[in-house]
Design a protein with these regions (language model features):
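Helix-rich terminal scaffold detector
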Residues: 1-11, 15-24, 184-311, 315-318
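Short, glycine/charged-enriched hinge/interface segments at domain edges or termini
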Residues: 2-21, 75-236, 371, 375, ...
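Flexible glycine/proline-rich
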Residues: 17, 24-27, 41-46, 55, ...
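Intrinsically disordered, low-complexity, positively charged segments
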Residues: 17-85
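Residue-level signal for inorganic ion chemistry
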Residues: 30, 73, 160, 196, ...
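Short, hydrophobic/aliphatic alpha-helical segments
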Residues: 48-62, 99-111, 158, 300-301, ...
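Glycine-rich, charged/polar anion/phosphate-binding loops
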Residues: 58-62, 112, 147-150, 179-185, ...
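Short glycine-rich, flexible loops that bind phosphorylated cofactors or substrates
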Residues: 119, 172, 269-271, 416
Length: 418
């Protein structure tokens, strides 16, 4: 698969006259304007965890590949009629990986272990605790339905059946399924390369000395970790000073090494917001004033044909925008398709009066079957991100929330995070 052409500078331009964009419309525009931007490569099943399938996966053989026993017991043919019966016990046994080579005739039984192939002529297994052995005879009392305690060939997966569709992001359990289906290699998309840039003269790297008028760069470690959990390859550009020349140089380095660029800070239109100014000067920036709290504005641009997501500098707003907007866009670029989080509709354990006009996301967690929210809605309270287990999504319209009312809870797990 060839790599798609680079984006045009006007890729993210909004229609004339649009000033405030609803969240749903912003997501729709992103889905429309972005496409998969990575090539395809083969990958061993053992190494495919987290990779995104470029082609559907077809079972190479049935599972189980032959009829086998679900229990330890004795194989026989055709089930048992009611009443006490005596069957000839054949010498030998059938064990997993050591199938019995002979033929089992009606009226005969053979020792069989769990997972072992049923011998030719057998279709039923009687539990070992339900029989008695006397000399070379098996004493058993029926009835027993034909096919009991036996697994049919292919009852789990049939050879030639589709087991995963293209775009599926593989999980550890999926690797077990593919191995069981006889697959050794699958076709996957190459990992999306995402460059991460933090801007701001006030920023210091974690662990460095900092004056009281400086702050530590919380966004870059957080965003890099999130991206790795989503199976993407991180290109860490570092902290960039607040001047146009440094920003241009950082964008050049990022565009050379990555498929997409994520920046935090400088996305607004202030005197020191050089990221948006540089993108605007190149003709490839659209400032999306999205009706969302926290998180506005979101700068979307193109640099050297590479899409740029300009996140707010505030860590809470940056995190929320990453989950709500960047994640579905990045998954689309990575080949997994545009995805929405799975919402849980649960009772609220809080009260709130919300004004109309924008969608709101509150840091929240589930306790005793109800959803509670962080004590402060202030986006400066970074600790609330770790306190929370997800986000409450409040609709664009005005709302009065009271305890017990059903609300929409988006757990972090629905965004691919623990």
């Amino acid at each position: 698969m060839s790599r798609p052409s680079k984006l045009n500078n006007d890729c993210f331009a909004l229609p004339a006259g649009v000033h405030w964009t609803p969240v749903s419309e912003a997501l729709h525009l992103l889905e429309q304007r972005l496409q998969c931007s990575v090539a395809v490569e083969p990958c061993a099943v053992e190494a495919s965890d987290g990779r995104i399938l470029a082609q559907s996966v077809i079972a190479a053989r049935s599972h189980p590949p032959c009829p086998n026993s679900a229990v330890d017991g004795y194989a026989l043919s055709g089930g048992l009629e009611a009443g006490a019966q005596s069957l000839e016990l054949r010498p030998g046994r059938s064990a997993a990986g050591e199938a019995f080579a002979g033929q089992l005739l009606p009226g005969q039984a053979l020792r069989i272990l769990t997972g072992a192939a049923l011998p030719n002529g057998a279709d039923t297994v009687v539990l070992q605790e339900d029989v008695r052995i006397k000399e070379d005879r098996l004493q058993v009392t029926g009835p027993l339905r034909a096919g009991s305690n036996a697994r049919a060939a292919g009852e789990d997966m049939q050879q030639g059946a589709e087991i995963f569709q293209a775009g599926h992001q593989l999980r550890p359990e999926d690797l077990g399924v593919m191995a069981a289906a006889g697959l050794g290699e699958v076709s996957v998309f190459k990992p999306l390369k995402v460059a991460v840039i933090s801007t701001g003269a006030e920023l210091r790297a974690p662990g460095q000395a900092a004056r009281v008028d400086q702050i530590f760069d919380a966004n870059r470690p957080m965003l890099c970790s999130v991206l790795r959990r989503w199976g993407m390859q991180v290109v860490d550009i570092g902290i960039v000073p607040d001047d146009a020349a440094s920003v241009r140089a950082a964008l050049d380095r990022a565009a050379e090494r990555a498929d997409v660029i994520i920046t935090s800070g400088g996305a607004s239109a202030g005197d020191e917001d050089h990221m948006s100014a540089v993108l605007r000067a190149s003709g490839g920036m659209a400032l999306w004033r999205i009706a969302v709290k926290p998180g506005r504005p979101l700068a979307l641009g193109v640099w050297g044909g590479v899409p740029v997501f300009g996140l707010p500098g505030n860590p809470v707003a940056a995190f929320v925008c990453t989950l709500i907007f960047a994640r579905p866009a990045l998954l689309q670029l990575a080949g997994a398709g545009f995805q929405s989080p799975q919402a849980l509709h649960l009772p609220a354990a809080f009260s709130k009066s919300k004004k109309a006009g924008r969608r709101e996301y509150l840091r929240a967690r589930l306790r005793d079957g109800a959803v509670e929210v962080f004590a402060s809605e202030g986006s400066g309270r970074v600790s609330g991100l770790s306190w929370a287990e997800g986000l409450v999504e409040l609709p664009d319209a005005a709302a009065e929330i009271s305890p017990g009312q059903t609300i929409c809870f988006l757990p972090y797990a629905s965004f691919g995070l623990p």
